[in-house]
């Protein structure tokens, strides 16, 4: 069995740490919240993010970055996108050998429009890069941690890394498929969060299934258009990392992005909705990144543009809806 250091103690990092431990691997989690660290070590739980879930007793946690760095040659990066570059640079400064980096972040860097694997590669010295991959797909942490059937995709430019991810995580309740389209899998995971926020708004406003179905379908079209422009295989968006992740995130109250949108749809201001979130809603930040990226690439993304107006320009919801529905006639 292997050793894996998990950087990040949020809901998904915790759920995947539990999967790894149940698969027989040694797991050390790293985080900054002393209460969460003590709770994992003493009570085998992380109630701040997964209330009521009992974790494998073999999992340990630390706030000592060097301890986590030296624990293994395989790292699971389960941090918000905006925190990744700084943490990876700190890790890199302490390394003296190659490590494998597996990430589960679903975002795009605001300043550079880079995917998370590109951020990690940028922040690593070449001599420390033993391979970078992603694990992504329709996988709410709340369901994974109680062993409900889940399927996800593992992707890396290096087939050996994809296979490593599959071998580490796959078991009788978590099925892992390999996928060689890293660009598509990462973009699918990041871009669907935009549509999830919009889907939550639609639900919060009280609209029915017709509107929700239209939003997801046309949202997938937007994701595919930008994805192809950035080098993704369009077929990837019909798989787990695309429509699979889109469906689960746009239809569930487990989704923090859907929840953020729902609060806004019910009449809360954006600031009020954000202040009530216990965890990071990546879709908020990704909307801004992708809006500007689409403008730069001249890609038509009307849902993203409308959501950007709501989130960052205080465009009223009813006005935004009228703009979307009143666009010029087009073929599908």
Curated annotation (Swiss-Prot):
The enzyme's E.C. designation: 1.1.1.94
Tree of life domain: Bacteria
Keywords from the named record: Cytoplasm, Lipid biosynthesis, Lipid metabolism, NAD, NADP, Nucleotide-binding, Oxidoreductase, Phospholipid biosynthesis, Phospholipid metabolism
Pfam families associated with the record: NAD_Gly3P_dh_C (PF07479), NAD_Gly3P_dh_N (PF01210)
GO annotation, cellular component aspect: cytosol
SUPFAM superfamilies: 6-phosphogluconate dehydrogenase C-terminal domain-like, NAD(P)-binding Rossmann-fold domains
Catalytic residues, chain numbering: 192 (proton acceptor)
GO biological process: carbohydrate metabolic process; glycerol-3-phosphate biosynthetic process; glycerol-3-phosphate catabolic process; glycerophospholipid metabolic process; phospholipid biosynthetic process
Top EC class of this enzyme: oxidoreductase
Subcellular locations according to the entry: Cytoplasm
Gene3D superfamilies listed in its UniProt record: N-(1-d-carboxylethyl)-l-norvaline Dehydrogenase, domain 2 (1.10.1040.10), NAD(P)-binding Rossmann-like Domain (3.40.50.720)
Binding site for NADPH: 11-12, 32, 106, 141, 256, 280, 282
Record-listed sn-glycerol 3-phosphate binding positions: 106, 137, 139, 192, 245, 255-257
The protein's annotated pathway: Membrane lipid metabolism; glycerophospholipid metabolism
Any one GO molecular-function label of the UniProt entry: NAD binding
Catalytic reaction(s) noted: sn-glycerol 3-phosphate + NAD(+) = dihydroxyacetone phosphate + NADH + H(+); sn-glycerol 3-phosphate + NADP(+) = dihydroxyacetone phosphate + NADPH + H(+)
Record function comment: Catalyzes the reduction of the glycolytic intermediate dihydroxyacetone phosphate (DHAP) to sn-glycerol 3-phosphate (G3P), the key precursor for phospholipid synthesis.
PANTHER family: GLYCEROL-3-PHOSPHATE DEHYDROGENASE (PTHR11728), GLYCEROL-3-PHOSPHATE DEHYDROGENASE [NAD(+)] 2, CHLOROPLASTIC (PTHR11728:SF1)
Family statement: Belongs to the NAD-dependent glycerol-3-phosphate dehydrogenase family.
HAMAP family referenced in this protein's UniProt entry, alphabetically: NAD_Glyc3P_dehydrog (MF_00394)
Protein name per UniProt: Glycerol-3-phosphate dehydrogenase [NAD(P)+]
Record organism: Staphylococcus carnosus (strain TM300)
């Amino acid at each position: 069995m292997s050793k894996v250091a998990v950087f990040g103690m949020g809901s998904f990092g915790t759920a995947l740490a539990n999967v790894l431990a149940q698969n027989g691997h040694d797991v050390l989690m790293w985080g900054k919240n002393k209460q969460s660290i003590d709770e994992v070590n003493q009570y085998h739980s992380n109630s701040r993010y997964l209330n009521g879930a009992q974790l494998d007793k073999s999992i340990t946690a630390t706030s000592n970055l060097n301890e986590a760095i030296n624990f293994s040659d395989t790292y699971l990066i389960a941090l918000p996108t905006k925190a990744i570059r700084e943490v990876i640079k700190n890790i890199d400064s302490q390394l003296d050998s190659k490590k494998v980096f597996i990430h589960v972040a679903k975002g795009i860097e605001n300043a550079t429009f880079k995917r998370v694997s590109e951020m990690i590669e940028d922040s690593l010295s070449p001599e420390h890069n033993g391979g970078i991959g992603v694990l992504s797909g329709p996988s709410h942490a709340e369901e994974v941690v109680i062993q409900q059937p889940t399927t996800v995709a593992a992707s890396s430019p290096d087939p050996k890394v994809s296979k490593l991810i599959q071998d580490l995580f796959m078991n009788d309740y978590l099925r892992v498929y390999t996928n060689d389209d890293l660009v598509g899998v990462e973009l699918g995971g990041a871009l669907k969060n935009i549509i999830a926020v919009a889907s939550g708004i639609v639900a919060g406003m009280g609209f029915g299934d017709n509107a929700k179905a239209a939003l997801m379908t046309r949202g997938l079209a937007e994701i595919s258009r930008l994805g192809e422009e950035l080098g993704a295989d369009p077929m990837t968006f019909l798989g787990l990392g695309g429509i699979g992740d889109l469906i689960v995130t746009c239809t569930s109250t487990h989704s923090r992005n859907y929840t953020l949108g729902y609060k806004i749809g019910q009449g809360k201001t954006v600031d009020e909705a954000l202040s009530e979130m216990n965890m990071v809603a990546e879709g908020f930040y990704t909307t801004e990144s992708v809006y500007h990226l689409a403008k730069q690439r001249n890609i038509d993304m009307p849902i993203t543009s409308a959501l950007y107006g709501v989130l960052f320009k205080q465009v009223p919801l009813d006005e935004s809806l009228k703009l979307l529905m009143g666009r010029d006639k087009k073929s599908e």
